[in-house]
Amino acid sequence: MEDFVRQCFNPMIVELAEKAMKEYGEDPKIETNKFAAICTHLEVCFMYSDFHFIDERGESIIVESGDPNALLKHRFEIIEGRDRTMAWTVVNSICNTTGVEKPKFLPDLYDYKENRFIEIGVTRREVHIYYLEKANKIKSEKTHIHIFSFTGEEMATKADYTLDEESRARIKTRLFTIRQEMASRGLWDSFRQSERGEETIEERFEITGTMRRLADQSLPPNFSSLENFRAYVDGFEPNGCIEGKLSQMSKEVNARIDPFLRTTPRPLRLPEGPPCSQRSKFLLMDALKLSIEDPSHEGEGIPLYDAIKCMKTFFGWKEPNIVKPHERGINPNYLLAWKQVLAELQDIENEDKIPKTKNMKKTSQLKWALGENMAPEKLDFEDCKNVSDLKQYDSDEPEQRSLASWVQSEFNKACELTESSWIELDEIGEDVAPIEHIASMRRNYFTAEVSHCRATEYIMKGVYINTALLNASCAAMDDFQLIPMISKCRTKEGRRKTNLYGFIIKGRSHLRNDTDVVNFVSMEFSLTDPRLEPHKWEKYCVLEIGDMLLRTAIGQVLRPMFLYVRTNGTSKIKMKWGMEMRRCLLQSLQQIESMIEAESSVKEKDMTKEFFENKSETWPIGESPKGVEEGSIGKVCRTLLAKSVFNSLYASPQLEGFSAESRKLLLIVQALRDNLEPGTFDLGGLYEAIEECLINDPWVLLNASWFNSFLTHALK
């Protein structure tokens, strides 16, 4: 289409159209239909005015060639095609000299013979529909409207066609030719369907009563009334320089706009320091499950019953010992806590009837691990406001940490497929409305791509743990309740499976506010030796608790089984969000949908089936030091899901800040790639805002490192 436009229209028209699009931040290379429409409209405006003059007697005449010395004045003033400032200047000057009412919107022409502005319309739809839209938009009796269509129809205000038959026939013939040329190149259908209706701007409605008083109270200083403020705002030229706008606003502001070039941006500075450590609420790639297939035991579905059944599948328990102590904790207490869990589970089995929940004895090791009686005593402010040296605790700045390789490994693992399916087809939720076939189809394709993904396992594990912990926090506030960490899935053959990852012991939980903290101790099974990456496990005390027989390619091997124990905490609001982790599925489905939509609008048909079934096509997944990584559509689905899940698992103020601030830099870089010549002021301040979020959070550090890869490749 772009080539067609450049061949078909006069270069001056093409240049004007490009300028107009650039003024509104649109790209002629991308919005090619719009490009063609603007050129067509410009050409019709020029043809409308061509050869029409007013002679000395004030009569309208048509002169195609003739005496260059004749005293002729152009009958039409062309307003369309000028830049906005110039166009309004022309309109204002016409209004001042002729006394015609000033139009609300920029018209296309002024007719000196009839003394009226003219709005020209060129439509690919029905002329009367377009005429009504135009009339509705400009709502002015004074501006004359004249609409042409590509099928040779026309419509004008009061059927007054302004021009003679022959001049109008020239315009209609030209439009018909453009249509045929487009059709012969297969461009017409797309062009015809891409026409949008006129955007009508809401009429100003009168504000009265309370709203009026509130409006008057909330004006910026120095404005006496709402009208006076509106007039000021309307006086801003939409494309004046930013510097000008700023200087109008305040005498103190002085901004110098610096051009943003390919050489301008520098990489983000990542912090230095010891490598960052794992901070998720439960183990991810390092978790180990004890599982039962086709569970049918008595009390199946009751977490404690399921947990005991899973524990019984393992026979390699041994006397536990500490292999990686916690730097600052009392490590023997962690060891005693695990022994206590084993002993109390044994006690349950010796009882006649297994209880549905288990509250642990409040031993000294658990009291220590759960921070019992550790909180400083709270005093009423009235009682202590007279204390002379009352002060807030000094809190240390968080220690800076560097990015460690384990974070990328965790992410890669989250994108992988597992042997089991973690969600049923309807997990994303049926739509309430009688959903069209397409949406269900998309959902089913997407579910098929992600149901076996490890990120989906993390979702279900997170939902289970948070739900169980929130329930126990409300139901057993004072008890140290033992909560098994469980998930359910289906094997390749479709058999049900229940998995136990370990246990949580919850501390006292009188949670009044959303942010009140409940402490818990987590104990999770793993085959990962903590001594390989000790920095990752800084917050854990790790015990060796057994040996597991594993089937490998070379036969059976005996591997030590570890227990990762740590004290942790969460709050009502965090548990509420944890329970809603299934939203990650929805978020990534919507991202995939927008990709399908983009593809479908180019091809002008629904591309869902081709999108998911064309296995040969690859899609961009992300940036790495090697360049843009590509993969199958399934890989894209799983990567988007993993990102969404990690945003939930590693949610933090650092992530919020980094996402918001880095997005600004991203948009500037994208504008540069789209040749929009962006300018910036205080780029240093933006870098500062981004980098103050890079402290010690593993997920934020990984995202920053990805951002740097993106910068490198985007600016090549």
UniProtKB/Swiss-Prot annotation:
Phosphorylated on serines and threonines by host kinases, including human casein kinase II. A motif (Nuclear localization signal 1 (NLS1)) lies at residues 124-139. Coiled coil: none annotated. Mn(2+) 2 binds at residues 80, 108. Its cofactor is Mn(2+). It is an enzyme of class 3 (hydrolase). One of its GO terms (molecular function) is metal ion binding. It comes from the Viruses. GO terms for biological process: cap snatching; DNA-templated transcription; symbiont-mediated suppression of host gene expression; symbiont-mediated suppression of host mRNA transcription via inhibition of RNA polymerase II activity; viral RNA genome replication; viral translational frameshifting. Its EC number is 3.1.-.-. It is found in: Host cytoplasm; Host nucleus. Keywords: Cap snatching, Endonuclease, Eukaryotic host gene expression shutoff by virus, Eukaryotic host transcription shutoff by virus, Host cytoplasm, Host gene expression shutoff by virus, Host nucleus, Host-virus interaction, Hydrolase, Inhibition of host RNA polymerase II by virus, Manganese, Metal-binding, Nuclease, Phosphoprotein. Pfam families: Flu_PA. Mn(2+) 1 binds at residues 41, 108, 119-120. Its main location: host cell. A motif (Nuclear localization signal 2 (NLS2)) lies at residues 184-247. Binds 2 manganese ions per subunit. One of its GO terms (cellular component) is host cell cytoplasm. Belongs to the influenza viruses PA family. Plays an essential role in viral RNA transcription and replication by forming the heterotrimeric polymerase complex together with PB1 and PB2 subunits. The complex transcribes viral mRNAs by using a unique mechanism called cap-snatching. It consists in the hijacking and cleavage of host capped pre-mRNAs. These short capped RNAs are then used as primers for viral mRNAs. The PB2 subunit is responsible for the binding of the 5' cap of cellular pre-mRNAs which are subsequently cleaved after 10-13 nucleotides by the PA subunit that carries the endonuclease activity. Influenza RNA polymerase is composed of three subunits: PB1, PB2 and PA. Interacts (via C-terminus) with PB1 (via N-terminus). This is Polymerase acidic protein.
